[in-house]
Amino acid sequence: MSERKGISRRTVIKGALAGAATGIAGFPYISYGQSDVIRIGHLTPRTGFLGPLGEFAVQAVDLAVDEINAGGGVNGRKIELLKEDSVNPQTASTKAERMVERDKVACIVGEISSASGLTISQVAERTRTLFVNTGCNSDELRGKGCKKYMFHIESQNSMYVKTCGRSLLAQGLVKGKKWFSLTADYAFGHDLLRVSKRFMAANGGDFAADKLVPTDATDFSPLLLEIRSAKPDLVISNLAGNQITNFLKQYTEFGLTYPVAGFGFDTALAWGAGKGNFHGTWPVVWHHLIDTPATKKFVADFTKRYGRPPENQAWGDYNAMKLIAQAMAETKSIDSTKLVEHFEKGAKFGLMKTRDGYFRKSDHQMMHEMYTVQALPVAQIKNQYDIFSSSPPVPGPSEPLEIIAATEDENECKMA
């Protein structure tokens, strides 16, 4: 049994029992195994407005680690997972540093908040520890804030905007149109608004209004009244977390009929809104209805274990853990610098889609397919999860994957 300085065995057992009684948001999970395990740190929001997404992330990373260990681990060594609630940027930084300095993790995986992702990446860079971001979208993390030891399986905001933008252009909702946007008032939202304005300017549209919304806001009625008065051609959501769920529910209650679309999206938030409350066109990095053998297996395994299908955050954390294990096996090393070199050489990874993905060397963004989903009419909804139809993969099969990503001119990255 490995020991943990400052935490007695009795404290760990009591905490674990409390965590089992209260669910995954309880005491941080620490698995104790043989001394030659590979320790990996997992940080993600498990409380607050991003907590519902963090719950999927934790469940998925547990599933991935259990599968890896059941298959013999990595190079004969089991993975030991240390999981913590990242809470906020300052706490995320503190916990990341503790994981590296005290717990000697080989790498860190996770996060959803772009602000917390930035502080974790600073620790990772200073300590030369691999950090694989699974949920932070901001272009800035791949641009001004890019780091040698940070990689992104989650798509950047530009990829979300360009993917959804294709559908909006096809629907005639861009050129000459007026948009009313609602934006989460933190790093992710600010970055997404900047990217969406760039897209709109390039395609002949304009904003009737853009409103910043505090992350703890729950009452959208004043903004809905403004939307009603503005009579926009399209209402755009740059919201995040349970903001999206609350907005969609209240939009329906107000009886507004203006088309809705979003540039930031997680399927769990649409599920939370409920039947009849999900509207419009949205981009997504992955969803549970993708028709590939790998997706079908993941959905079946996750649903059997947790009683519900996985959503896109679950996809990100699950695949991040799997690709880290794959890279460690291929390099026969857990050294972060060697793993960085392996990723930068164009290693390919199966991501449950029709094409393999790879990390772009210039900014460490995963190049992979995305999708646009369209809310189904209520009469066509058969259950609480299958509430949308999906586009084919974006980009198309004859297009390069990089076509939807930010160009170097749009988002320059200069790594030290």
Give a label for each model feature:
Residues 2-17, 24-416:
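Extracytosolic ligand-binding ectodomains
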